[in-house]
């Protein structure tokens, strides 16, 4: 675990770089986190996903799965993979300041 | 007179009926079990059918043979469950009112979730082995197959029995070797996970087995669609994998009746307390086995360990006592590895599979995270244990909670 400064605010991050506390996150941090994931520019489509994830996390208390983003968020799976290549659930959660999604056994 | 309703008479529901029927006071409680099918399938046996080790007759028995005699059994499809009104409506119009309900409606494959899967070539050169129809159709294909490229693909997690697809490729390696055509068969294991299995130590151990057996591992592959015409499996990112024979482990989902009743998540699994097994939404509803949304394996062994905890919690609920948060995610899986050998893993929510001896620390006779002949015999003997002890709710010499005794930290 380490602390880091994102958009001028000091936050705690876990070993893989996910924010420890989702409440530390501000929208200003997203572009920096996105760059760390290899995404240079966040478009409106990216923001639609990020905002859905934030809102769903607030309501449900867990990071939404790809299927939940499709069913509840109305975001086609194909779009998710185009926007966040190689692991959209993990990357989008990272940028949205949420913890790493729990894998299943 | 109060009414306990058990919805689902598969492994989990049958075990629960057998445990509760002898102990609930019959002057105060009656028990009804609802299921829509008459036949009980020994699902762990499906794995062996494509290789001609088991046939259909080896894995089926009438469900009624396993229900206790002093409960009511209704064989009929359910229209809808209305937990806010404590009642269940059957498709034939009957209405069943309950005081306490246990849901054990399981999970099943849903190949239609993947574009192009259910075309003309479904069960021609694309098969599942999680249904009796799929496993027997695949047997007929493999019996006469002269070789080519076999791709085994897990579409998405979670799936029932997460080790079964690995066992399938291990057995394929053995079978085609025995048939003398292993050099004509390419085997590729394609998974959305970052490795052969979820947990790091077991993933490494099982990954080495794949390498040793000359099975290609393609990880981080999220299957998006099947192009049946060109025998190609595509990921969501348009990576292409060609096959001659595609064995798919399709999307697993809970029962449609759970979806229709608004009781489940996106996959029709029911939000459930991971330690007490009580529904998160309805106090008088408990959930058991594959029907839950728990981050545990969907497997008979898990249902068995859950049943021990639920047996106690149902009695506590009835007696107005606080529930015991005793379920720890314990799973215990024999992994058939081919050539008459097997591997055993034992783990829970927090502790990943570790090497050691089981069930007696230091003695065994089974070995954890090691390949032995004894583990294979454990797997083959399990069918007898399943029909004669497990379903009947008998005590097995294994604690519901996982123990560290006999395990080695690595």
Give the ranges of each region predicted by the language model.
Chain A
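N-terminal first-folded block
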Residues: 4-36
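Helix-rich interaction surfaces within compact, conserved domain-sized segments
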Residues: 13, 65-105
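A short, structure-level motif marking secondary-structure boundaries and short turns
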Residues: 14-16, 50-52, 74
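A short, ordered amphipathic alpha-helix with a cationic face
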Residues: 18-24, 55-58, 66-67, 79-80
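General structural signal for secondary-structure boundaries
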Residues: 26, 43-45, 76
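Metallocofactor- and cofactor-centric catalytic cores in central/energy metabolism, strongly enriched
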Residues: 30, 35-54, 58-59, 66, ...
């Amino acid at each position: 675990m380490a602390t880091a400064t994102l958009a001028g605010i000091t936050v705690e991050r876990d070993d893989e770089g996910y924010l420890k506390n989702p409440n530390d996150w501000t929208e200003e941090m997203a572009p920096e986190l996105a760059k760390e994931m290899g995404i240079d520019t966040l478009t409106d489509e990216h923001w639609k996903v990020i905002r859905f994830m934030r809102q769903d996390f607030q309501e449900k208390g867990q990071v939404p799965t790809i299927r939940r983003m499709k069913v509840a968020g109305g975001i086609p799976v194909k779009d998710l993979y185009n926007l966040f290549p190689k692991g959209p659930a993990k990357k989008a959660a990272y940028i949205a300041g949420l913890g790493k999604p729990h894998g299943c056994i | 007179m109060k009414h306990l309703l058990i919805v689902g008479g598969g492994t989990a529901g049958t075990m629960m009926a057998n445990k509760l029927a002898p102990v609930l006071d019959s002057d105060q409680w009656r028990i009804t079990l609802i299921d829509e099918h008459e036949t009980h399938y020994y699902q762990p046996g499906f794995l062996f059918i494509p290789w001609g080790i088991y046939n259909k007759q080896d894995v089926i028995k009438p469900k009624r043979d396993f229900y206790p005699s002093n409960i009511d059994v209704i064989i009929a499809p359910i229209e809808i469950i209305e937990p806010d009104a404590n009642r269940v409506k059957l498709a034939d119009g009957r209405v069943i009112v309950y005081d306490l309900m246990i849901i054990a409606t399981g999970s099943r494959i849903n190949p239609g979730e993947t574009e192009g899967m259910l075309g003309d070539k479904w069960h021609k050169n694309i098969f599942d082995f999680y249904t009796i129809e799929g496993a027997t159709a695949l047997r007929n294909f493999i019996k006469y197959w002269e070789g080519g490229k076999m791709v085994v693909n897990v579409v998405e997690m979670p799936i029932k029995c997460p080790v079964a697809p690995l066992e399938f490729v291990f057995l394929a390696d053995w079978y085609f070797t025995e048939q003398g055509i292993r050099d004509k068969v390419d085997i590729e294991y394609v998974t959305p996970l970052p490795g052969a299995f979820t947990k790091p130590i077991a993933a490494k151990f099982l990954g080495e087995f794949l390498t040793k057996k000359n099975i290609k591992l393609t990880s981080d592959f999220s299957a998006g669609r099947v192009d049946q015409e060109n025998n190609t499996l595509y990921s969501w990112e348009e990576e292409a994998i060609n096959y001659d024979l595609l064995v798919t482990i399709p999307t697993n989902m809970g029962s449609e009746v759970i979806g229709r009743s608004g009781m489940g998540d996106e996959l029709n699994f029911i939000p459930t307390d991971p330690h007490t097994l009580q529904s998160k939404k309805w106090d008088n509803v408990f959930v058991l086995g594959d029907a839950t949304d728990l981050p545990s394996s969907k497997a008979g062994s898990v249902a068995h360990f859950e049943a021990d905890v639920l047996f106690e919690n149902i009695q506590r609920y009835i007696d107005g006592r606080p529930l015991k948060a005793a379920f720890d995610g314990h799973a215990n899986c024999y992994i058939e590895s081919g050539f008459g050998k097997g591997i055993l893993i034992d783990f829970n929510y927090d502790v990943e599979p570790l090497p050691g001896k089981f069930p007696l620390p230091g003695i065994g006779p089974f070995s954890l995270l090691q390949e032995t002949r004894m583990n294979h015999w454990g797997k083959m003997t399990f069918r007898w244990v399943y029909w004669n002890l497990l379903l009947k709710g008998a005590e097995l010499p294994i604690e519901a909670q996982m123990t560290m005794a006999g395990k080695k930290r690595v």
